[in-house]
Amino acid sequence: MAVDIAMKFYLRSPPLRRDRVECRIARKSNEPLRPCIQTTDKTLLSELSNQENKVKKRVSFADSRGLALTMVKVYSDFDDELEIPFNISELIDNIVNLTTVEKERFVLDFVQPSADYLDFRNRLQADSVCLENCMLKDKALVGTVKVKNLAFQKCVKIRMTFDSWQTYTDYDCQYVKDTYAGSDKDTFSFDVSLPEGIQSNTRIEFAVYFECEGRIFWDSNKSLNYKIARQDHRIPSNFESRHYDPVCMSVDQYGSPRCSYGIFPELPTYSGFDKLGPYY
């Protein structure tokens, strides 16, 4: 039995060797070999080739082709007037008028005399006349004047110039009936309209005078005159630029308007009511 088994294995070995040889020999094929590395897409290659085939842009100047380097165009005036819509023309007129009004805007170039009540009272007592308050309203100067009641017949006037005192005009003040009878002071009011076309290089000034029993009393703002200036030409007064030293000032226990105006300008003293007319 052992011999038979050996023979069987021997007879079967050659086919195994033949199959091994067939596996080692690769079959030849006519198809081209494909690379194992993936190449660029065909569409991308075609785009690159098209870009290379395109002609590059070039810059050329007009003079190299016999043309002029500059071009001049001449426009003639319109034969017919340009028609502007009504709303636009009205807007332009309003802008021009607004600019003119801003240029002719005036302001008072002095401090209201009644802002400092103690000084106002002393001036009235010494000069017998003093401007109380005034304001500019619709290109008109309006205000009040206080005078001492020296006699029944009185004449109070405003002397005003619009051309730096080359000429001047006197304007009458009207008597204002006092609420309290028997007062030793009288009140007069005035309303002076400012003329049109005032020159920008001239000064507008005024003073107050009071005639009584053949005597004349003047209030010329301590010989400085009361000035009206254009808003862009206004010069700050010494009163506005004055600095108060709180250490050197004593507080008035009775709440004097002088003290309140100097240290506490936000408090509602007489300085805040200078446009309301007489206050006594």
UniProtKB/Swiss-Prot annotation:
Assigned GO CC terms: protein phosphatase type 1 complex
Keywords: Carbohydrate metabolism, Glycogen metabolism
GO biological process entries: glycogen metabolic process; regulation of glycogen biosynthetic process; regulation of glycogen catabolic process
GO molecular function, one term: protein phosphatase regulator activity
Domain CBM21: 121-229
UniProt motif PP1-binding motif: location: 58-61
Gene3D superfamilies recorded: Carbohydrate binding type-21 domain
Swiss-Prot/TrEMBL domain comment: The N-terminal region is required for binding to PP1, the central region is required for binding to glycogen and the C-terminal region is required for binding to PYGL.
Protein's job: Acts as a glycogen-targeting subunit for phosphatase PP1. Facilitates interaction of the PP1 with enzymes of the glycogen metabolism and regulates its activity. Suppresses the rate at which PP1 dephosphorylates (inactivates) glycogen phosphorylase and enhances the rate at which it activates glycogen synthase and therefore limits glycogen breakdown.
Assembly mode: Interacts with glycogen, PPP1CC catalytic subunit of PP1 and PYGL. Associates with glycogen particles. Forms complexes with debranching enzyme, glycogen phosphorylase, glycogen synthase and phosphorylase kinase which is necessary for its regulation of PP1 activity.
Name of protein: Protein phosphatase 1 regulatory subunit 3B-A
Species of origin: Xenopus laevis
Organismal lineage: Eukaryota, Metazoa, Chordata, Craniata, Vertebrata
